[in-house]
Amino acid sequence: MEQGTNSRGRPGRPKANLEIDLYSTPAGARAVENPVRRTILAALRERECTFEEIVSLAGRAKSTVSVHLQDLAAAGVIGSRPDPEDSRRKIFFLTGDLVASVLPETRVADDLAAYAGMYRPGSGDPFAFYRLAFRTIRVSLMQEGVLLDPLLTRAGEWLGEELYPAVAAPETGAFCANIARFWEEHRLGRIEVAETEPLVLLIYDCFECVDLPVTGKPACAFDSGILRALFSRHYGRPAEAVETRCYSMGFDHCRFEIAVEGGGREECRTPE
């Protein structure tokens, strides 16, 4: 759809001040730079919308919004269907997912080595290199202002689904203990249950963020996805792992509150 140019005017690396959202579609990845289109897609990520609702949210003339919708549809980012209450109207929806965003204000200007660290052969830790590789990729993207949180969350959810049988337990306390044991055995961090009503987990030495720059924002999208999938399976209904503290926010641990659909924060109890 839209492509950045480098300082010499050739297609390539985005301009330093360019904000871009990257969407996956059935036809491949699509980059969206135009702020009006980004606003439209942000609204559609929340829910499906009618044309009139999109016009109101975008704050642009109907003719302008219509052109943007046509281009987004042609790129395969959105689709539409007739409104069941009025066949003359259309309801618009996303056909893909937000994969990443390039946001100049989130660029990390510090030296990569300060956060990526060094690999020391013979350290005796078989997981050290893989943690280093994950951290280096993450910080390299942060230096460019690229946020992969949506993609990392979905990857975490997939992994959580695969992991669930290995940690499943009918009682919530035992379930949390199994998760903590798995985290420690695989050098992912140390998990403690800080509160039971609601259920709050603390993660120390978190593999995902312990060495990341302090940005003031949560950084554990991958962990959030894993925990979301695990507790959704455990409680038998959609759950969220809401990160309220993180190493990247200046804390010495990460803190997750487990929120379950229809019940707010979930208590640590045996599910009925």
Where on the chain are the PLM-derived regions?
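N-terminal accessory segment detector
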Residues: 2-24, 30, 56, 62, ...
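Low-complexity, intrinsically disordered Gly/Pro/Thr-rich segments
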Residues: 78, 237-246
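Active-site helix/loop of acyl-thioester processing domains in fatty-acid/polyketide metabolism
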Residues: 218-236
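Short capping segments at the starts of secondary-structure elements
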Residues: 35, 46-50
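Short helix-coil-helix linker/hinge
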Residues: 30-37
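Residues within the helices of the helix-turn-helix
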Residues: 51-52, 70
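Short alpha-helical segment immediately N-terminal to, or the first helix within
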Residues: 42-44
